[in-house]
Amino acid sequence: MIGVLGVKTEVKLDIREKLSIIPKRYESSLMKLKEKCDEVVILSTCNRTEVYYSYKKHNENIISHIFKCLNWDENYKKYTFHYKDDEAINHLMRVICGFDSLILGEDQILSQIKQAYEIALSSKSVNRDLNKLFQMAITCGKEFRNKSQLYKIPVSSASIAVNEGRKHGGKNFMVLGYGAVGSLAVKYILSGEFDKLYIVVRNPSVVDLRDDRMTIINFNERGKYYKDVDCIISCTSAPHVVVDAFELPKHKNIVVYDLAVPRDVDEEVRYMKNVKLYDIDNISCINDENCSKREDIMNNNLFVIEKYEREFEKWRKTSEISPHIVNLKKKGDEVYKKRLTTFKNKKYTKDVDALAEIMLKSTSNAYINKAIEVLKEEQLKGRGEECLRIIEKIFYSAQ
């Protein structure tokens, strides 16, 4: 069975924080979950936390096991959803295509799911079912974007934050963190007008961009530069607050966008008269001008999702008989190798053509005689008609 346990997108941020998984705990969490499931993939972004799993043996306590492994309070179960098999598969396909998101059609989710899959792959927490499902989902996401051409009207929490920052008169930006979201925010800032950009990182070597208006500063020195900016975009993976209220200037207007979950910005910042603070929920509520256009385009391309759902279901059904196919091939090898040995031993002592005919006839009889034997047995059991239909399909239609 394949399933997914996730946090509902409409749940308030303070609850989502308690049900989040920070990146540095991914691998240890995967290992704990792997003890209860056959396969596991963790997807944790600023807008969603989801655990995809598979297992062969029935486990009615799977949700409790997941909560326990992740040290989540079971009183929060009501804030989660749980889908199985077809619903879980459909959910992943829709998510990777940008549906079921706080920001419809967001363009970060494909790379985020790909990264989640790669972490699970390197941690050896996926093998057959989830491996194939995520491979197909990633291909589905790429095809969906190509067919819908959503790249022409991109949207993400980073793009909204940068655009809104500019609307508030932002010219001097600071971006804290240079992961997937941070690097995207930097890209959007560099593509438009600005005076100064400060990129705050723990390891300056990760930023390989060059621009005279850009300054890379060490994380520990960030407080010195708050007075020089009018827009802060924070998107680190820290489990604690990184922007404290007491560090911000008291007499300078600043707009702050907190794109992190758990939140990067001290909640006290919200009460500062000279600072406007927007968290990820506030940003997700900003209905950008292209929202309805993206929705129409996406709905017109739902057939892509349906196509990959059918393909995965087809793969699942055929993969169930894979062990039998392997055994059939082994049996075929046994039949021909035994006769090949006989042919090699006798080809110089008998007429080669006659010997070849005998060997080929023997190979054919090995299967025909067994088919006749099974057909007779099934006829006596009242299943002769069904057996004959299969035999006809195998032998009579063979070329």
Curated annotation (Swiss-Prot):
Source organism superkingdom: Bacteria
Site feature: Important for activity: H91
Keywords tagged on the record: NADP, Oxidoreductase, Porphyrin biosynthesis
Stored PANTHER family: GLUTAMYL-TRNA REDUCTASE
Pathway(s) annotated for this protein in UniProt: Porphyrin-containing compound metabolism; protoporphyrin-IX biosynthesis; 5-aminolevulinate from L-glutamyl-tRNA(Glu): step 1/2
Protein name per its UniProtKB record: Glutamyl-tRNA reductase
Organism encoding this protein: Clostridium tetani (strain Massachusetts / E88)
Further information: During catalysis, the active site Cys acts as a nucleophile attacking the alpha-carbonyl group of tRNA-bound glutamate with the formation of a thioester intermediate between enzyme and glutamate, and the concomitant release of tRNA(Glu). The thioester intermediate is finally reduced by direct hydride transfer from NADPH, to form the product GSA.
Location of the active site: C46 (nucleophile)
Residues bound to NADP(+): G177, Y178, G179, A180, V181, G182
